Regions:
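Non-heme Fe(II)/2-oxoglutarate
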Residues: 1-78
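Extracellular structured ligand-interaction cores
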Residues: 2, 78, 88-92, 99, ...
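Solvent-exposed residues in well-ordered beta-strands and their adjoining turns
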Residues: 10, 96, 171-173
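A general structural signal for short secondary-structure junctions and capping/turn motifs
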Residues: 53-57, 81-85, 135-138, 157-161
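Secondary-structure boundary elements
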Residues: 55-61, 96-101, 175-178
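Short His-Asn-centered micro-motif
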Residues: 67-68, 82-84, 93, 147-150, ...
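Catalytic core of non-heme Fe(II) oxygenases with the double-stranded beta-helix
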Residues: 72-144
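Catalytic core of Fe(II)/2-oxoglutarate
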Residues: 118-188
Length: 188
């Protein structure tokens, strides 16, 4: 795959359920709707434990770590195609999954003015008319996937059940998707 890679990353998370302080909420279908995506603060000691599970060559890079929940039942079963404008890639360690598929697109990247944008969270939805789906993967609980967040991508839940997807996310600000992937390949 060009825009996603399954990697060997399994952090110890004995206290992850304590991550309850909300850092940000976004991806609402309307102004008064519940947020689809909520990011939670992870205490520093827990973040340090997560960092030690990374390849040693990545432990001192500029990263942001949080716990994220996505409730696709609030948003027509999908998180529309979007790109991130701050970090270059993200490592998702999936705590709970429900048959969601992540798809990547190629084509002209234009903001979609009809969908709420980032609320300061540094991402925006993109117009799908000029995009073509090029690859898709399904993540499972306990897996870790590295994603190229500058490439348009979408999360779609295939099941009728609207369970919350729960994950730990590690955002890499200064390294590209390909650079981070190489660090994981060398570490194996």
């Amino acid at each position: 795959m060009r825009y996603a890679s399954k990697v060997n990353f399994k952090p110890e998370l004995p206290y992850i359920n304590r991550a309850k302080v909300v850092l940000g909420e976004h991806a609402k279908s309307s102004v008064d709707a519940d947020a689809v995506l909520i990011r939670y603060y992870i205490p520093e000691k827990q973040q340090d434990m997560i960092k030690t599970a990374l390849p040693k060559t990545l432990q001192d890079t500029t990263i942001f770590i949080c716990r994220t929940t996505i409730d696709l039942g609030n948003f027509e079963n999908d998180l529309k195609p979007h790109v991130h404008t701050n970090e270059q890639c993200v490592l998702n360690y999936y705590l709970t999954t429900n048959g969601e598929e992540t798809s990547f697109f190629e084509g002209a990247v234009e903001p979609d003015p009809n969908i709420a944008t980032d609320n300061g969270n540094l991402y925006y939805m993109v117009n799908t008319e000029k995009l073509q789906k090029v690859e898709t993967f399904q993540s499972n609980t306990g897996e870790s996937w590295l994603l190229s967040t500058r490439q348009p991508h979408q999360v779609f839940c295939k099941t009728e059940q609207h369970k919350v997807r729960d994950m730990v996310q590690i955002y890499f600000m200064d390294l590209s998707f390909d650079e981070v992937r190489k660090h994981f390949e060398v570490a194996q």
